[in-house]
């Protein structure tokens, strides 16, 4: 599972739209869309904000090993 899919899945679990997530992060809906589609890598402060918001460690969302482990499941 790629980072973009992890964020999309976490957002969907909570029933949040891209706009709702964007509002909580203080970014545009287009930024959330770009992250979810892999067109944009979030800045470090934004990555930490995403992890905090979803109550996950940054490694759970953005770590390459996490992606490989989830893809193998």
Where are these regions (language model features)?
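Short basic helix-loop element that most often maps to the first helix and adjoining turn
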Residues: 5-24
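Short linear/disordered segments characteristic of secreted peptide precursors
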Residues: 8, 42, 65-68
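Recognition helix of helix-turn-helix/homeodomain-like DNA-binding domains
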Residues: 27-40
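DNA major-groove recognition helix of helix-turn-helix/homeodomain DNA-binding modules
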Residues: 45-60
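Short, charged recognition helix plus adjacent turn
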Residues: 52, 62-73
């Amino acid at each position: 599972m790629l980072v973009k899919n992890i964020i999309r899945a976490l957002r969907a679990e909570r029933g949040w739209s891209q706009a709702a997530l964007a509002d909580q992060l203080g970014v545009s809906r287009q930024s959330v869309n770009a992250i979810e589609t892999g067109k944009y890598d979030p800045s470090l402060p934004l990555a930490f904000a995403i992890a905090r918001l979803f109550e996950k460690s940054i490694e759970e969302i953005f770590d390459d090993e996490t992606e490989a482990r989830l893809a193998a499941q």
